[in-house]
């Protein structure tokens, strides 16, 4: 659970990756964010909220030398599959996938949680379109 201190890394320090690094409390949910990786030279060697950003080229070596339980994937979708294969081949147990590509793990022991912002937006659209009585009842249930 939430008190285990699972080791995690974040891959892709673009807008979404930076937002997660700076605003999401991984520790609260039982994850110790150990490192982040990116290809942009201006980011490499810097740190966000105490998490150092490493060159993406060093990821295989990092994975070989460190136990990583989970990875947060924020890379461009063109790199999603190859990055997932790299992670799973190095024994990463779980991937929190923000790439907008529906990923499945080549390793049956790896869990992939695909996050699709469009699903959340569709849910909102559905809720907005319900008539007022249904909306009021749903709001009462959801806001308890």
Predicted regions and their residues:
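HTH-adjacent hinge/linker in prokaryotic transcriptional regulators
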Residues: 1-7
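Conserved N-terminal Rossmann-fold NAD(P)-binding element of oxidoreductases
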Residues: 11-12
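Hydrophobic/small residue at the entry helix of a nucleotide-binding pocket
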Residues: 16
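Short, solvent-exposed amphipathic alpha-helical segments in soluble enzyme
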Residues: 24-28, 87-90
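NAD(P)-binding Rossmann-fold cofactor-contacting core
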Residues: 27-49
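Phosphate-bearing ligand-interacting subdomains
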Residues: 50-142
């Amino acid at each position: 659970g939430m008190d285990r201190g699972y080791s995690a890394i974040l891959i892709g320090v673009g807008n979404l990756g930076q937002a997660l690094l700076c605003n999401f409390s991984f520790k609260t949910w039982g994850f110790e964010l150990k490192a982040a990786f990116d290809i942009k030279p201006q980011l490499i060697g810097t740190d966000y909220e105490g998490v150092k950003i490493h060159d993406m080229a060093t990821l295989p070596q990092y994975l070989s030398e460190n136990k990583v339980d989970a990875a947060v994937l924020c890379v461009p979708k063109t790199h999603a599959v190859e990055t997932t294969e790299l992670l799973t081949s190095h024994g990463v147990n779980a991937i929190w996938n923000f790439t907008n590509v529906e990923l499945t793990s080549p390793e049956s022991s790896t869990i992939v949680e695909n996050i699709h912002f469009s699903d959340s937006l569709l849910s909102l659209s559905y809720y907005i379109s319900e008539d007022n009585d249904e909306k009021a009842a749903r709001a009462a249930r959801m806001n308890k």
